[in-house]
Amino acid sequence: MAEFPASLLILNGKSTDNLPLREAIMLLREEGMTIHVRVTWEKGDAARYVEEARKLGVATVIAGGGDGTINEVSTALIQCAGDDIPALGILPLGTANDFATSVGIPEALDKALKLAIAGNAIAIDMAQVNKQTCFINMATGGFGTRITTETPEKLKAALGGVSYIIHGLMRMDTLQPDRCEIRGENFHWQGDALVIGIGNGRQAGGGQQLCPNALINDGLLQLRIFTGDEILPALVSTLKSDEDNPNIIEGASSWFDIQAPHEITFNLDGEPLSGQNFHIEILPAALRCRLPPDCPLLR
């Protein structure tokens, strides 16, 4: 095998007992690849490991986990100063893996690992909220976000996507649309939003295509707002994301401002952020990511 620069794998602590992953790493090491492995235990670990990766001089930092792990590692990478910043590699090990799935990362661990180490590094965008928090995939808001956040893990494990509908029915008396005003380039909307999706990537919630036209290197955010008066039909339609839904409002802009008279919550790659005012902007070509040559999210 051709020689490749060293890589550092930042592995989510929940995946440490993954025997196939251990075997894949050992096999690549036997073939001559240098792969350092670090395991996260708490928030902040990923940033420290990225700093260590720079001191080691690795060419790639691999995020081994779900969307949250990819978010942490990519955020740490774009905060690096200077030259020779490592590229991002992706090893999907989470329960949803929305970003990895949408960009075409192989499901097979050995293939995904080889791509993460030896794939072509492409400059991609990220998004930033209120000049602080970042997301690489999507920000989602509305009652759908509250349902997916609050649905018990045991119910999700037992029933999958149906669990969200059941939990939504149980919460019917407390679910209300979010009244808000959203502005962007050549875009202005005000009303009651059942679900809001602002995407650098296309899907969230374990496969829901909320922003099907999004690209990760076009310098734009895609916006989709689901409106409607009846909660139950809206809940079902948002899970199905019907293209013919008359209650879908779309927009595209390099930034969006969102204001609400009450506190609303956005889910940023799995992490909640609450407030009344949000400024969301694209960060063009913020980092390099190793992607397959046929990645559908590249223009």
Swiss-Prot record:
Record note on cofactor: Binds 1 Mg(2+) ion per subunit. Ca(2+) may be able to substitute.
Catalytic residues, chain numbering: 271 (proton acceptor)
Residues binding ATP: 40, 66-72, 95
Positions bound to Mg(2+): 215, 218, 220
Family, per entry: Belongs to the diacylglycerol/lipid kinase family. YegS lipid kinase subfamily.
HAMAP family assigned: YegS
Protein name as catalogued: Probable lipid kinase YegS
